A protein has these predicted regions:
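Terminal alpha-helical segments
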Residues: 1-133
Length: 133
């Protein structure tokens, strides 16, 4: 898949997660979502979208199965320190806190979406310039 298409695909994941989280029933009085199932789904979709974008800009050797988060952090550290910081925060927020724990806090979920967009934006910025032939 071309790099531009991977970035667009990553953004599509974020849009899908936005639709999913709407089903989590937000309680404005408590400032929480009421259904963790949709939080978990949205968090996992967000993180998957980030992985699509990261695969576009990071050179990671593929072995058996999916590369570990450590490989992504190592590759990002060599390429761009700001991307590394976003990956560390994003992994914790989207994959662990949202995706596994299903944290219902609106602030946590909003932070997950912000981090996903930050990672994808940074990957887009780091994409090599298209070669015009």
């Amino acid at each position: 898949m071309e790099i531009e298409n991977q970035i667009a695909e990553a953004r599509r994941y974020v849009a899908n997660a936005e639709e999913i989280i709407k089903k989590a029933n937000y309680d404005p009085e408590l400032k929480i979502y009421t259904d963790s199932k949709y939080i978990k789904t949205a968090g996992n979709i967000l993180w998957s979208g980030c992985l699509v974008a990261l695969d576009a800009v990071l050179d990671i050797r593929k072995g058996k199965g999916r590369p570990s988060i450590e490989k992504y952090k190592e590759a990002a550290g060599k390429r761009d320190r700001k991307l590394l910081a976003a990956i560390v925060a994003g992994y914790d927020t989207m994959h662990l806190v949202m995706g596994y724990d299903g944290n219902k806090s609106r602030k946590v979920c909003d932070a997950g979406f912000e981090l996903a967009n930050a990672i994808i934006d940074r990957c887009e910025m780091l994409c090599p310039e298209p070669v015009i032939v």
